[in-house]
Amino acid sequence: MSVIDASALIEILLKDETAAKSRRLLSHDLFAPAILIPETVNALKKSARLKLVTKAIARDKVAFLSLLPIDLVPMQRLSLEIWQLSDSLSAYDACYVSLAMQLEHTLITNDRRLAKEARRFVDVTILD
């Protein structure tokens, strides 16, 4: 079981969705703070705006989000931990780290800066 962040999910959705590693990740129990959805939608919108993908592909990926086997956790239960972690992390990144801490799960990310900071608190897997 793992906590997945938006950078890892975007990597899977846009660049690597057919790879064996991604299929393996998506077949495991995954958790994320509810902020995963707006962060992922924002990244997909930006990718379309920058013409990295077409609007149709980005829209299809957004629709696919609701089908993913990811348990979303409301963020209000993470508020205090987010506050405490936000000295060294953005509040957004702290959402993922605090959830991984609470659940005692590995954090999956594609953000090397986040991974470096998060390793002080949880195990981290970086997508390559």
Where are the regions that the model predicts?
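Acidic catalytic patch
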Residues: 57-87
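Acidic, PIN/NYN-like endoribonuclease modules and their adjacent C-terminal/linker elements
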Residues: 1, 97-128
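Helix-loop-beta junctions that constitute the ligand-sensing/allosteric loops
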Residues: 90-92
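Short, well-structured N-terminal submotif of metal-dependent ribonuclease cores
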Residues: 1-35, 50-59, 112
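Short glycine/serine- and small hydrophobic-enriched flexible loop segments
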Residues: 42-49, 102
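Short active-site oxyanion
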Residues: 28-30, 70, 101-106
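Phosphate- and divalent-cation-binding pockets in alpha/beta enzyme and binding domains
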Residues: 21, 39, 81, 116-117
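A general alpha-helix detector
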Residues: 39-43, 61-64, 81, 99
